[in-house]
Amino acid sequence: MKQYSVGNQHSNYRSLLFPFLCSQMTQLTASGNQTMVTEFLFSMFPHAHRGGLLFFIPLLLIYGFILTGNLIMFIVIQVGMALHTPLYFFISVLSFLEICYTTTTIPKMLSCLISEQKSISVAGCLLQMYFFHSLGITESCVLTAMAIDRYIAICNPLRYPTIMIPKLCIQLTVGSCFCGFLLVLPEIAWISTLPFCGSNQIHQIFCDFTPVLSLACTDTFLVVIVDAIHAAEIVASFLVIALSYIRIIIVILGMHSAEGHHKAFSTCAAHLAVFLLFFGSVAVMYLRFSATYSVFWDTAIAVTFVILAPFFNPIIYSLKNKDMKEAIGRLFHYQKRAGWAGK
């Protein structure tokens, strides 16, 4: 009976010890696998022979237009003395940000469309996320500064020249960059410390917080917290700009001169269109929380978010802007004359 009880105890020990050792081995294996994740794979891109080239050419043309249009806007404002005002200073900053903003994602998209290697290193992914969101937040801050500029110009025109001096414009721009590049830094630093396990496939066309965090060995509530932080940032900027424009519209409607109505509305219409375009695409992209879409619509929303505002901003600011059209015409006329003189 004693021998039987001892054997039974050994059997009990083994039944308790074996699962414990298995769990420890599983954790060690998982830990080893986590350290092996050195790159992420983009799973949303088609192969080159399955339609990748079909998407490559339109995206390349769109990227070329974004670079050319925003670069022309930036150069025209810098060289045109008549455009050296706070309004056009912020437009030139916005154009420069659009160039940098699209360059963080579109070149990698183009590479993935024609290459069989659709991967990005972990460090490269973190850098892409950092610059993409930093530039996006900076752009929203610049749009806020532009709304404040229009608010002062229309609601307090007599004090406008003494308030919106070049020094203040530079300070607002530097402050926008400071906020943009500082706010995202803690999140990127936190993500860089997370262990990644299991699949390394990112179900998106660029590195973004939610797709990357879904691959980490962490609780999903962290993803919800990050989403809530981003939503608060977006809503705060939106409210500041929206309230400014509501006040502007009230003041414009109170003007007695029809000419004053037309001039004020034409001045603010372009900025209001850019504001709605930017925050509309941001809202569709980030204020959906747990809502899910099909692969097609998810990709379409991401592409639209990346290219929509940068593509239309040069068109909006130059289409009905007399000063901008005249400045662009003078620039090209000067280039044409310089070319003839060179010949």
Swiss-Prot record:
Keywords: Cell membrane, Disulfide bond, G-protein coupled receptor, Glycoprotein, Membrane, Olfaction, Receptor, Sensory transduction, Transducer, Transmembrane, Transmembrane helix. InterPro entries: GPCR_Rhodpsn (IPR000276), GPCR_Rhodpsn_7TM (IPR017452), Olfact_rcpt (IPR000725), Olfactory_GPCR1 (IPR050939). It is found in: Cell membrane. CDD domains: 7tmA_OR6N-like. One of its GO terms (cellular component) is plasma membrane. It is a multi-pass membrane protein. Disulfide bonds join 125-217. Glycans are attached at residue 33. GO terms for molecular function: G protein-coupled receptor activity; odorant binding; olfactory receptor activity. The chain crosses the membrane at residues 54-74, 83-103, 128-148, 168-188, 225-244, 265-285, 299-319. It comes from the Eukaryota. Residues 75-82, 149-167, 245-264, 320-343 are cytoplasmic. GO terms for biological process: detection of chemical stimulus involved in sensory perception of smell. Residues 1-53, 104-127, 189-224, 286-298 are extracellular. It holds the Pfam family 7tm_4. Belongs to the G-protein coupled receptor 1 family. Odorant receptor. This is Olfactory receptor 6K6. It comes from Homo sapiens (Human). The gene is OR6K6.
